[in-house]
């Protein structure tokens, strides 16, 4: 992730003409190479493979792969929004009369909020406001994915709409002038269906201890690479600012990185990337979880480390600005923790490359701290910081806007600042 915040970011996503290569070719690579853990599992997977050769299935696939562009200007727009739990994704499709390139060209829409836990049955209508457009790698052509946020019919953001508040913070003049960059490291775990046990693990048992799996290569060390690669290509096709992927410390766990992205775009891109991953695992017959500690015991949890910098941090003398930001973050530690994802107390134990949830800490190149500063940043005297506290199920709208608010808009008292500086051995 050190490279993510060193490059110039692409601030605005522009729709370009999609590749002529049919997007369906991408999914031909989604083949699960599961280790033979039990005869029943192997038989189940082989039956699935045989069914895919069925002539009926093939006819359905041929229809899915139809290119409609030669016959109509109409396109399909998939409207995507966050559901009632604050982490679940919902979507539905509509036909548009012609291709569009900007969210302002799209109509608002509505859905039944009583079926998503976001509105009562007697007044169930929730309004979708289109906010960001991405190319659709599943349908190809001029078809699009639309990230939306959610409002009452009167135009008020509903409680689960965290994007609206984030947009307010990022539109603040002081925040806007600092051009905040975010690089987000999304970890996730792939599970075998029906048993909800990590992909590649023997059902009800465990593989060898952690060590060989991080960025590992080989059938005995890497399970789920096809899904990770398919997701990577789908994100690139869609126009998501994805910057890399890797296998994680716990087998069956993977990570992708988004960024550097500016302001509200970071949240839009992460949520769309999550949507693509949900769809790909759906097609592959694999369960996706963002649980921050999917397996108890001596196994790493899943986080969503967030790398952050401002214009002042990236300029000469920026390390002093970073230290002031760390001081502010220390004083609002518990406020950030409460907003950084559910179940995070099971992950932030002080073990497995985490800091204790109850104690704020920072360090250079120390992955056991709340906030890590890279050695390059220390050496150059400018750069970025990494907030290692967010859980894998965090809302990127909340985390990114809270980082900006705490470091750019919130001012502690001089007394509190002095005490925190002394406690953290910070000279600011």
UniProtKB/Swiss-Prot annotation:
Residue ranges, annotated region (Disordered): 94-120
One cellular component (GO) term of this entry: chloroplast
Pfam families: Gln-synt_C, Gln-synt_N
Family stated for the protein in its record: Belongs to the glutamine synthetase family.
GO function term, MF aspect, one: ATP binding
Cystine pairings recorded for this chain: none
Function: The light-modulated chloroplast enzyme, encoded by a nuclear gene and expressed primarily in leaves, is responsible for the reassimilation of the ammonia generated by photorespiration.
Record EC number: 6.3.1.2
Swiss-Prot/TrEMBL catalytic activity: L-glutamate + NH4(+) + ATP = L-glutamine + ADP + phosphate + H(+)
Membrane-spanning segments: none
SUPFAM superfamilies: Glutamine synthetase, N-terminal domain, Glutamine synthetase/guanido kinase
Complex and partners: Homooctamer.
Domain GS catalytic, first and last residues per copy: 159-428
Species whose genome carries this gene: Brassica napus (Rape)
Identification of the protein by name: Glutamine synthetase, chloroplastic
């Amino acid at each position: 992730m050190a490279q993510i915040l060193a490059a110039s970011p692409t601030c605005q996503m522009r729709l370009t003409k999609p590749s002529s290569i049919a997007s369906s070719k991408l999914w031909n690579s989604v083949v699960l190479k599961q280790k033979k853990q039990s005869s029943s599992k192997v038989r189940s997977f082989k039956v699935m493979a045989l069914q895919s050769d069925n002539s009926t299935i093939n006819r359905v696939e041929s229809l899915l792969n139809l290119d409609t562009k030669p016959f109509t200007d109409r396109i399909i727009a998939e409207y995507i929004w966050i559901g009632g739990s604050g982490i679940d994704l919902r979507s539905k499709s509509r036909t548009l009369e012609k291709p569009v390139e900007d969210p302002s060209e799209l109509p608002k829409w509505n859905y039944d909020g009583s079926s998503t836990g976001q509105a009562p049955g007697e007044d169930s209508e929730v309004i979708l406001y289109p906010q960001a457009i991405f190319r659709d790698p599943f349908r190809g052509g001029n078809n699009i994915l639309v990230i939306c946020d959610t409002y009452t019919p009167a135009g008020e953001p509903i409680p689960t709409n965290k994007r609206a508040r984030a947009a307010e913070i990022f539109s603040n003049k002081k925040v806007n002038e600092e051009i905040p960059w975010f690089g987000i490291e999304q970890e996730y775990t792939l599970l075998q269906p029906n048993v909800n046990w990590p992909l590649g693990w023997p059902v009800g048992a465990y593989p060898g201890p952690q060590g060989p799996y991080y960025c590992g290569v080989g059938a005995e060390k890497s399970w789920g690479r096809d899904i990770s690669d398919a997701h990577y290509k789908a994100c690139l096709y869609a126009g998501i600012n994805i910057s890399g992927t890797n296998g994680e410390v716990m087998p069956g766990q993977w990570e992708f990185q988004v960024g550097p992205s500016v302001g509200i775009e970071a949240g839009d891109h992460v949520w769309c990337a999550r949507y693509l991953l949900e769809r790909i695992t759906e097609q592959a017959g694999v369960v996706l979880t963002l649980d921050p500690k999917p397996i108890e015991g001596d196994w790493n949890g899943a986080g969503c480390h967030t790398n952050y910098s401002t214009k002042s941090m990236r300029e000469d003398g920026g390390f002093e600005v970073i230290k002031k930001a760390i001081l502010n973050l220390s004083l609002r530690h518990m406020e950030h923790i409460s907003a950084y994802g559910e179940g995070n107390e099971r992950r932030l134990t002080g073990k497995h490359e985490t800091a204790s949830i109850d104690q704020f800490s920072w360090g250079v190149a120390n992955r056991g701290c709340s906030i890590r500063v890279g050695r390059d940043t220390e050496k150059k005297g400018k750069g970025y910081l990494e907030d290692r506290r967010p859980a894998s199920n965090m809302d990127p709208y909340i985390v990114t806007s809270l980082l900006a608010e705490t470091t750019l808009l919130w001012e502690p008292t001089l007394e509190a600042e002095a005490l925190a500086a002394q406690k953290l051995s910070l000279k600011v």
